[in-house]
Amino acid sequence: MSTHRPFQLTHGSIEHTLLVPNDLFFNYSQLKDEFIKTLPEPTEGFAGDDEPSSPAELYGKFIGFISNAQFPQIVELSLKDFESRFLDNNNDNIHSFAVKLLDDETYPTTIAKVKENIVKNYYKAVKSINKVESNLLYHCKHDAKLVAIFGGQGNTDDYFEELRELYTLYQGLIEDLLVSIAEKLNQLHPSFDKIYTQGLNILSWLKHPETTPDQDYLLSVPVSCPVICVIQLCHYTITCKVLGLTPGEFRNSLKWSTGHSQGLVTAVTIAASDSWDSFLKNSLTAVSLLLFIGSRCLSTYPRTSLPPTMLQDSLDNGEGRPSPMLSVRDLSIKQVEKFIEQTNSHLPREKHIAISLINGARNLVLSGPPESLYGFNLNLRNQKAPMGLDQSRVPFSERKLKCSNRFLPIFAPFHSHLLADATELILDDVKEHGLSFEGLKIPVYDTFDGSDFQALKEPIIDRVVKLITELPVHWEEATNHKATHILDFGPGGVSGLGVLTHRNKEGTGARIILAGTLDSNPIDDEYGFKHEIFQTSADKAIKWAPDWLKELRPTLVKNSEGKIYVKTKFSQLLGRAPLMVAGMTPTTVNTDIVSASLNAGYHIELAGGGYFSPVMMTRAIDDIVSRIKPGYGLGINLIYVNPFMLQWGIPLIKDLREKGYPIQSLTIGAGVPSIEVATEYIEDLGLTHLGLKPGSVDAISQVIAIAKAHPTFPIVLQWTGGRGGGHHSFEDFHQPIIQMYSKIRRCSNIVLVAGSGFGSDEDTYPYLSGYWSEKFNYPPMPFDGVLFGSRVMTSKESHTSLAAKKLIVECKGVPDQQWEQTYKKPTGGIITVRSEMGEPIHKIATRGVMFWKELDDTIFNLPKNKLLDALNKKRDHIIKKLNNDFQKPWFGKNANGVCDLQEMTYKEVANRLVELMYVKKSHRWIDVSLRNMYGDFLRRVEERFTSSAGTVSLLQNFNQLNEPEQFTADFFEKFPQAGKQLISEEDCDYFLMLAARPGQKPVPFVPVLDERFEFFFKKDSLWQSEDLESVVDEDVQRTCILHGPVASQYTSKVDEPIGDILNSIHEGHIARLIKEEYAGDESKIPVVEYFGGKKPASVSATSVNIIDGNQVVYEIDSELPNKQEWLDLLAGTELNWLQAFISTDRIVQGSKHVSNPLHDILTPAKHSKVTIDKKTKKLTAFENIKGDLLPVVEIELVKPNTIQLSLIEHRTADTNPVALPFLYKYNPADGFAPILEIMEDRNERIKEFYWKLWFGSSVPYSNDINVEKAILGDEITISSQTISEFTHAIGNKCDAFVDRPGKATLAPMDFAIVIGWKAIIKAIFPKSVDGDLLKLVHLSNGYKMITGAAPLKKGDVVSTKAEIKAVLNQPSGKLVEVVGTIYREGKPVMEVTSQFLYRGEYNDYCNTFQKVTETPVQVAFKSAKDLAVLRSKEWFHLEKDVQFDVLTFRCESTYKFKSANVYSSIKTTGQVLLELPTKEVIQVGSVDYEAGTSYGNPVTDYLSRNGKTIEESVIFENAIPLSSGEELTSKAPGTNEPYAIVSGDYNPIHVSRVFAAYAKLPGTITHGMYSSASIRALVEEWAANNVAARVRAFKCDFVGMVLPNDTLQTTMEHVGMINGRKIIKVETRNVETELPVLIGEAEIEQPTTTYVFTGQGSQEQGMGMELYNSSEVAREVWDKADRHFVNNYGFSILDIVQNNPNELTIHFGGAKGRAIRDNYIGMMFETIGEDGALKSEKIFKDIDETTTSYTFVSPTGLLSATQFTQPALTLMEKAAYEDIKSKGLIPSDIMFAGHSLGEYSALSSLANVMPIESLVDVVFYRGMTMQVAVPRDELGRSNYGMVAVNPSRVSATFDDSALRFVVDEVANKTKWLLEIVNYNVENQQYVAAGDLRALDTLTNVLNVLKINKIDIVKLQEQMSIEKVKEHLYEIVDEVAAKSLAKPQPIDLERGFAVIPLKGISVPFHSSYLMSGVKPFQRFLCKKIPKSSVKPQDLIGKYIPNLTAKPFELTKEYFQSVYDLTKSEKIKSILDNWEQYE
């Protein structure tokens, strides 16, 4: 039976459960009920201030609550449970636990709450504290030096609240001490009752807060002095008791102590106390002494009132309430002493002020009368910078002071002469009360001279008194003793002495711990809090403060090859000496100095500011890379204030880095980018480090913010201050660094480099060593490196001209203190001017630069409204100075001398341009862009002076200007007037526009004096010093030469190699360090395997099982270790080849740097292991493959300094594992890049690996494949099993692919890749296709069924032939295009087109080619000239002499390449085709072109200029979505192995994590072919309704990676048509990223479709006109026919359709009219006479040779007249067809039929049996013959018509036979013509033709049958047929009689089952018209040429009206036609059928 029960405390959502004894459960429950009542109602969200925030706080509050109750057992049990649960059984301290709660995001809380709920209640309940050795005290016994300090007055106004909090939290620990002290104070203070007007009962004030005096009373020194001491004693007591130590035991851990001002008393107290008794005794002495000190000081220097105005003024200026002590910060002692001297000079001695506390180098306190200190403040205000004043552009020495001065809340002038009298009184009190401190066991240091009190001969207490009252505090002296951890016991917390001391001690290795404050550590962890004292942990870890000198000072290291380096953070980062050359224009623009510096072993920056385009910079970088040692990297410097350059510079760097260029760093000068921009640089550019050059304290802060945002990325902070050469700030070099050094060093990733003013080892060594700062009274502040600029300008490799170099040597320079004089005058040969960017810039004070300075001071500083006036006034002076002294002379110059531009002739302008921009001496232009500018000006001259149009330009190419003098002379001979004509105003503007044109080199002259003068004067002003030949008179004094005023001191030689300059400095540093650090013994320098790169890290990965033996085994289960820790673990701590290989960030490939693949390959994987042989260091990695742990990576040293990395793949074609070997050279001489890949045969090794992978190890590897020949694949029989496995792998569930009996089993289109894989993939193996297969990307894939070919199916025997269509070098890599053709029984079935891309950069153009089937082009010839141009082309061969207006060209080309833009050869051949009017296409010519080196293809150029492409797809304006997309969501497979197996594509990037990692892929990417197949299956389903055969083509581009289990969403849209097939656009996106992964296009055949053309009867006015207006194609059909009608028959068919006139007159005037009349006369038709004989008659009997006009008349409109109806309807249908055909809507294999008249439209449209003109002739003739075939009255009306009949409307039983019966009997009975002529829809729609009377009779007979419900069918069953006829005749007779009685001709009306066809007055298709058949047949024969009838267009497609069956070319079909027609021609064919076979 359990003896415990769970007991739960809850508050809102917070709960805590503990097990309590059964016998106490009731008591617990009672206490809980009472406790809950004390809690407020729970709040939602964050807990309120009075609520517990966590289970621990809830439990703590409960423990505090029950500690007041009478249940000691419960308290004890609960406390034990609390300690067990939260304090790890007291292995953790309550303070540490409380601080941890502050970082708990689950239960947010505050420091106040954890103090109240945790700390207070814990100590309320705890009865005893065991002795615990904290981590800190443990280290005190070993390596830590712990000291204690105590503060003084003035830290805070509310110091008493600190004591109150202590009493609240730790009452039980300090109660006894406080009682004793309170008693002592109560004994003493009555003696000073006039002072202690409100008493001194501190215990009462603590217990009863309402009795606490006001703040003024508490701040009075008699009260504050003893109470502050009480606070410190309490803190000390709490510390000892929490640790379980006596004061003596804790003191033994302290090395020394001291106190600030009165804090000395407490320091002496703890030093003299070795037990609680002695501590109490000494504590009472201390508070007694301080009571006397406070009282006597006040009585000696009483507090007096101040004038209200003084008080208010002081408060208004933020200086606080005047008191006897004033804090002054951020001024040096010298500066403050100067102000004191000024102030005291106006005061009597007793009012003097003095420095009383020197807290730090720039932290002082003054003591004196408040009025005097107020006067000091007034004096300081005059020179103090107001808040917000921007002084960044003011020289540092001239700036107003930035400082803080504020009165302290201390009301006695401590540490000054003003308290001398108080000293004596205090000492009397001491003697009177017998106070003393004896037996100090640890040093306590004097605050005046830093001496040890233990050595004092006078009484310690006497010295203490004097140190508090009179002697100034030198706090740095007092604390200048060894310490690693300093405990500040208050008061004041973060406002107290600890933080002040931290500022002094920062960087010295002393960590400040605020022993009196509990809080979480600050963000930067600058100092610690109370909990650090008590922290306990198994690892005994404590925090240490940085020691700048120890950690950052330079040391030496020697690599395995004996080379010595100065080791700093900078040199460790670079693996080079810690010296660099800064990017500076123009010096480091040139590649010589950059290459030389790098090869000498020193980092240097290419000055990007000297380049104006990406091409220029790339060319320079290529040059550098080709000249430097492999592994070396360069830096690039860009100017932040030049946004134009950044716009192209940053993308260029990114692009080059991605290509592997060894660009190591980017430095941004002249501004610090924002964090966002810097982040882009850091994350996107692939740099080793980012250099930033801040120019001010604020800018340094920006750099720090950037570094903090990227704590693991190196930021090189280059500090140059204002003394640097070239552009510079206004800053002092030292002061900003002193101010910001500690903040900089808190960012471990910042590398600090000093620059400017340096030139030797001697002047730079103090900065590397850090001792430079000591002269400013700061601890050593080492820099990590030094940069040089001016110093290298005279180097041999510098392009600085010799004269400029000599001028630099002549400059003497100045020391640091004098450089600011350059702002006003030449100093050391240097002066500051304002650059084009408005920034200060140092230049040598040449004549030209002094003129620049003059203009800066007199012209360029003027506002715009005064500028022009000043320029005009000084015009002559400025022009003279330009011509005599400056590098850019005045442009204007004519025969008379100096002039303005507008006073020059065109020729003079041209000559002047040549004079100033062309360097005659060396026969070159200053820059090619200036040559081109000159060319543009000459072309303007040509435009002005060329008199005739069509004149060929003299300047065809700018290269003609390479020697401009002769060309210019010849040029102006052609245009003599240009030598006389002054340049026009318009051309002046054009000239100035050219001169200022962006993108070209700025002009070397000044053309104008206006607001643009400064631009022309200053722009591009630095290059001249490097190219004196281009300067007038080669006068160096005209030029601008950048140089630093301080650095100038060190340049004494000309043409010293840069390597020698830098080596001498580096070797000087080495010699100095050997002497100082290694006692002159070089052998003591530590030796390492290599130097540079990452330091080895000692780590312990907790989730890794390590087995140690002959080989170390590292095993990973399901929990993964941190990647970096894992790599560090594998690398080990020993520097060797394996450590270098694993840890290096870069691998050298040739001249390129690529990221280390091991970082990805060795990424920790679940259930894997790694073994490392201890002896050989061979590493083998194993991973789980199908349940087995198999080796996947091996790394070993195969021979000295040669490493082999093998990647092993087990999933192969023959299942045998294959290894891919990579070879590397280990170069320990270069620690920055110690691993160089051996590139020889690398690609071949990779190809051989893939060959074995895809084809099997038994197939011999061969790269001897001819790229110009077809690659043959194996013959394969398609089986149902392979189809099934494939469809299963891709998830295609289409029924067509399922093997079932009785049907063919189709193979998916994608199956072609399985068939053709080996042939297609062999195309990437030829030796000439050289590329890295691991960088191969499948770009696209496409399938296309051959026209007419059936899909692949089971049982097909197929083979593949692959052809390489293209091998192209592109910017993104090498493109290989392969077309594989699948053959079945020797016939092509399908084409598979795949494009692959070898990512990278390739230049082997000799191996590249492209075979192109050019897009067919039609060329229209509008003139004889056009024809002549074509005939003149050598490549055009006309083979038939025919007339043509339009030709079609179908060509194929083969291109071979010489370079990216030049072909080595071109061959183009093809057919030239002509379409005849009959639509027949014949070849009339050919194209045959072949050429060698070419820049273009003249054939395609001609066709693209003159023609238009055809056979292109037609894209809809608005796409039609096929699905919403949601239902097309799919998931990528979790593994790619099934597809790899069925497809044969074993590329390991799809199945192997290791290979995918090597290829820099985010995972094993899904096969592109799988994605293609699975998405195509969706197309099959959604766009082809699961009819597989309808998908005729599918192509897709793989635009994004798909990873296992990715969720994909596909959308489909019907976007257009091509040749009658739907174009379906497919897009598949990754659902999570929303990025596209596949974009495809499918061609879907439409379902079997028959096109039907309507007949007569459907016409209406305006028909087809909407389409006519919107479709160009339709309009062309109408217009062509209309022209034919107008020209041949004199009327417009368009007019008839649009307006439907009732009559139309044709006039026969003129020759054209007569020809039209002849056409009418010639129209004949044949009829059968009464005698039965055939006779011919004119259709238009009224027209003869004398007729002048003819009028067509129709009462219902001419459109209803048959002769017009028929051509109009035919044209409407033809136009509609041609329109949809033009839109690609017509499939190639369709059936068609025409209803009646529509048969003509059908045949002419789909079978092209006649041109449009013949078509309209035929139907017009047909209409006319029919129109005249029936008699008509005078109104043109006939007695014939047609009706539509629906028998089903008569009755349900009235069917086809019934209708036929009734029609026949009506005809028989009436003898009128009545026939069914159209059988449209059985039982529903028929058309009857005949006599109107007969039609009317039929209508009404059917009405009678319906009304009377007479069932003819039933009657036929019930009686004989004769009887039925008899009854029917009765009805017919009655109805016919009524029809005869109606007005004739009858106007037919609608019946129940009959609808009249209005407008038809001819009995079409009836026997009545039989006589017209033969003549019409003869007419048709004339109009339909035999050549236009193509059987293939008719067989199986054309459904004639006659047969209602698809046309066949068979004897049976012809027989059926004969049976229907009795045609003699058909009979003749049948009789002679054998002849036709």
UniProtKB/Swiss-Prot annotation:
Pfam families for the chain:
Acyl_transf_1, Fas1-AflB-like_hel, FAS1_DH_region, FAS1_thioest_ins, FAS_meander, FAS_N, MaoC_dehydratas, SAT
Residue numbers spanned by region Enoyl reductase: 465-798
Residues crossing the lipid bilayer are none
| Chain segments carrying region Dehydratase | 1132-1612
Q: Where is the active site?
A: S261, S1796
One GO CC term of this entry?
Answer: cytosol
State the residue spans of region: Malonyl/palmitoyl transferase.
1613-1833
EC numbers, comma separated: 2.3.1.86, 4.2.1.59, 1.3.1.9, 2.3.1.38
MaoC-like domain ranges (all copies): 1506-1634
Q: Name one GO biological process term.
A: long-chain fatty acid biosynthetic process
List the catalytic activities from the record.
Answer: acetyl-CoA + n malonyl-CoA + 2n NADPH + 4n H(+) = a long-chain-acyl-CoA + n CoA + n CO2 + 2n NADP(+); holo-[ACP] + acetyl-CoA = acetyl-[ACP] + CoA; holo-[ACP] + malonyl-CoA = malonyl-[ACP] + CoA; a (3R)-hydroxyacyl-[ACP] = a (2E)-enoyl-[ACP] + H2O
GO molecular function terms here? Answer: (3R)-hydroxyacyl-[acyl-carrier-protein] dehydratase activity; [acyl-carrier-protein] S-acetyltransferase activity; [acyl-carrier-protein] S-malonyltransferase activity; enoyl-[acyl-carrier-protein] reductase (NADH) activity; enoyl-[acyl-carrier-protein] reductase (NADPH) activity; fatty acid synthase activity; fatty acyl-[ACP] hydrolase activity; fatty-acyl-CoA synthase activity
Q: Where is this region: Acetyltransferase?
A: 1-453
| Alphabetically ordered keywords of this record | Fatty acid biosynthesis, Fatty acid metabolism, Hydrolase, Lipid biosynthesis, Lipid metabolism, Lyase, Multifunctional enzyme, NAD, NADP, Oxidoreductase, Transferase
Keyword Iron carried by entry: no
From what superkingdom does this record's organism come?
Eukaryota
Q: Which PANTHER family match?
A: FATTY ACID SYNTHASE SUBUNIT BETA, MALONYL COA-ACYL CARRIER PROTEIN TRANSACYLASE
For this chain, the family text in UniProt reads: Belongs to the fungal fatty acid synthetase subunit beta family.
| Subunit structure, interactors included | [Alpha(6)beta(6)] hexamers of two multifunctional subunits (alpha and beta).
Role summary: Fatty acid synthetase catalyzes the formation of long-chain fatty acids from acetyl-CoA, malonyl-CoA and NADPH. The beta subunit contains domains for: [acyl-carrier-protein] acetyltransferase and malonyltransferase, S-acyl fatty acid synthase thioesterase, enoyl-[acyl-carrier-protein] reductase, and 3-hydroxypalmitoyl-[acyl-carrier-protein] dehydratase.
Name the chain's protein.
Answer: Fatty acid synthase subunit beta
Give the organism the record lists. Answer: Candida albicans (Yeast)
Taxonomic lineage: Eukaryota, Fungi, Dikarya, Ascomycota, Saccharomycotina
Question: Gene of origin?
Answer: FAS1
